[in-house]
């Protein structure tokens, strides 16, 4: 076959095929082949078209390949149906990914002690998507200098995690807060105040739990007394 076209070994063949989506959702498919760095042939509308740079070899090749209509039919099906369907699927998936919004979760902790009389405040933000996020340690409405931001790390579910720290004197930690800004939150920023969860927990343990126990004991005492009087 190759001897008929007077191709000399070695030789280089290049090819490109695909489909493009134009304005108005018109899809144009293409297949072009090159030989020794020059345009050789292209497949258009179920037919082989020789390129001028291909010369007589390109013309003879198109005559040769036209004898095999089954091959041209397969190429045409791939270009006109399979490729556009795949392209539209990729575009739909991309649009869904671009519009994906996942709200972050945030919590506070303390890190290793930086030194005597100092605290390392840590603000964790996880599970957010897309990646851009802003996390700040604040006092009132003022962002605190010295805030250190770690690398944004990819979670197993393709959301993101970020750790932001602040080194402060132990006596200056009260009144600090961590503010999280993310597109999924709109104008409803997450604000966590340092120390508040601990105080709430202490109040719950010291007041609410004993009160509940006392109420249960009183209820049992009244119930037993009422039962005893009923028997008498």
From Swiss-Prot:
This is T-cell surface glycoprotein CD1b-3. Disulfide bonds join 19-83, 48-62, 123-178. The chain crosses the membrane at residues 202-222. Its main location: membrane. Keywords: Adaptive immunity, Cell membrane, Disulfide bond, Endosome, Glycoprotein, Immunity, Immunoglobulin domain, Lysosome, Membrane, Transmembrane, Transmembrane helix. CDD domains: IgC1_CD1 (cd21029). Residues 223-232 are cytoplasmic.
């Amino acid at each position: 076959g190759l001897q008929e076209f007077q191709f000399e070994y070695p030789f280089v063949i290049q090819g490109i095929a695909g489909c493009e989506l134009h304005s108005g959702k018109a899809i144009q498919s293409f297949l072009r082949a090159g030989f020794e760095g020059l345009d050789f042939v292209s497949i258009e509308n179920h037919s082989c078209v020789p390129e001028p740079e291909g010369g007589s070899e390109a013309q003879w090749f198109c005559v040769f390949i036209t004898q095999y209509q089954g091959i041209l039919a397969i190429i045409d099906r791939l270009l006109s149906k399979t490729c556009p369907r795949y392209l539209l699927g990729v575009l739909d998936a991309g649009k869904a990914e671009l519009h994906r919004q996942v709200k972050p979760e945030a919590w506070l902790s303390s890190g290793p002690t930086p030194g005597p009389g100092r605290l390392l405040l840590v603000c964790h933000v996880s599970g957010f998507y897309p990646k851009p996020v802003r996390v700040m340690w604040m006092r009132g409405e003022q962002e605190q200098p010295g805030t250190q931001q770690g690398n944004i790390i990819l979670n197993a579910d393709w959301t993101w995690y970020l750790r932001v720290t602040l080194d402060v004197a132990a006596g200056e930690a009260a009144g600090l807060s961590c503010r999280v800004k993310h597109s999924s939150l709109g104008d409803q920023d997450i604000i966590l105040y340092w120390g508040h969860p601990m105080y709430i927990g202490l109040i719950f343990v010291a007041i609410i739990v004993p009160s509940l126990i006392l109420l249960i004991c009183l209820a049992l005492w009244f119930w037993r007394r009422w039962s005893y009087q009923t028997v008498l």
